[in-house]
Amino acid sequence: MAAQKIRIRLKAFDYRLIDQSALEIVETAKRTGAVVKGPVPLPTRIERFDILRSPHVNKTSRDQFEIRTHQRLMDIVDPTDKTVDALMKLDLPAGVDVEIKL
């Protein structure tokens, strides 16, 4: 039978939060005896918005805003029951989106 693995994908607007969360997940998994591959930084998604400064005229005058979405990917190979329980109880910051696939 193939080795079981857990794939964790993290998304956040702040790279410091995502790196801190990735470090907590890696430490928790290693403490319970699982092998961790990653965190692998995935490409940052940049969404840009152009807004007219004036409500009436001056089409050439615009403000530009952007949202950067940072992503990290990690695999936990051969997780034990203790690993899964520890990951479920882990308290991560509010700005981090966690996606777990078994």
From Swiss-Prot:
Q: Name one GO biological process term.
A: translation
Do you know which SUPFAM superfamilies this protein is assigned to? Ribosomal protein S10
Keyword Secreted belongs to the record: no
Entry keywords, A to Z: Ribonucleoprotein, Ribosomal protein
Q: Name one GO cellular component term.
A: ribosome
User: One Pfam family, short name please?
Assistant: Ribosomal_S10
InterPro entries xrefs: Ribosomal_uS10, Ribosomal_uS10_CS, Ribosomal_uS10_dom, Ribosomal_uS10_dom_sf
Gene Ontology terms, MF aspect? structural constituent of ribosome; tRNA binding
Free-text function comment from the UniProt entry: Involved in the binding of tRNA to the ribosomes.
UniProt cross-references to PANTHER family, sorted A to Z: 30S RIBOSOMAL PROTEIN S10 FAMILY MEMBER (PTHR11700)
What is known about its subunit structure?
Answer: Part of the 30S ribosomal subunit.
Query: HAMAP family, alphabetically?
Result: Ribosomal_uS10
Per the record, the similarity remark reads: Belongs to the universal ribosomal protein uS10 family.
Q: What is this protein called?
A: Small ribosomal subunit protein uS10
Q: Which organism is it from?
A: Methylobacillus flagellatus (strain ATCC 51484 / DSM 6875 / VKM B-1610 / KT)
Organism ancestry: Bacteria, Pseudomonadati, Pseudomonadota, Betaproteobacteria, Nitrosomonadales
> Which gene is the coding source of this polypeptide chain?
rpsJ
